[in-house]
Amino acid sequence: MRRYLMVACGLAMFGAYLGAQGGSGDQKGTPAEARLRATVANLRAGRIATPTDYDRLNAEQKAYVASILSGPRGDISGPLGVMMVSPALGDLTQKAMAYSRFAGREGFSSVPPKLNELAILMVGKLWSAEYVWNAHHAYAVRMGLAPETVEAIRRGVRPADLPKDEQAIYDFTDEFLRTHTASDRTLNAARDVLGGDRGIVDLVGTMGLYQISSMMVALDKTPLPQGVKPYFQ
């Protein structure tokens, strides 16, 4: 029953996406369908057999792609492409990841964007997740992290002269990832910066979700975009 409901809801979103883009769920040749086809065709498969032929997708997979393209992310490359082979898992994950990815927007994670990106980069470095790093290092600078901070994380050294808020989140993330716990002192410092327990839970959620993301691209050995050199070699 749950699988049936997921397919039914997904097909409804698929039809709504086509309609919103100027077509209908049963109408071929629309700009929306062309975008879906191009998105799938441009996926770069690694070791997991990510489908790149739109006509070979089943109903769940088409609904999964349409759901992502109609949401705030609008892109299905990297770990979300890997999870196309398990679209029910992918759909649940991409919705949770969107909540974390777009921190600071209404209805999304309460963690300030630059601190959210700080944690994401630290998780990406932990896993040497090239694809995650490529997707986030420049965005992290746009959100307010100093380029020197980003470079220090890439090199695996503690950034120097961190502002108080970044220092608290760096210490919490580092300690939690290394020891799988956090001292009261470290937790309380991060809690103060994030304004309470919701911020802490949102931050740990981001750390967990981006470990999933990093694990997926590590499993797949997802290629970087053409022309992009590896970051961790």
Residues covered by each model-derived region:
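Alpha-helical scaffold segments that form or flank carboxylate-/histidine-based iron centers
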Residues: 76-82, 112-126, 199-204
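Bacterial N-terminal signal peptides that target proteins for export
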Residues: 1-6
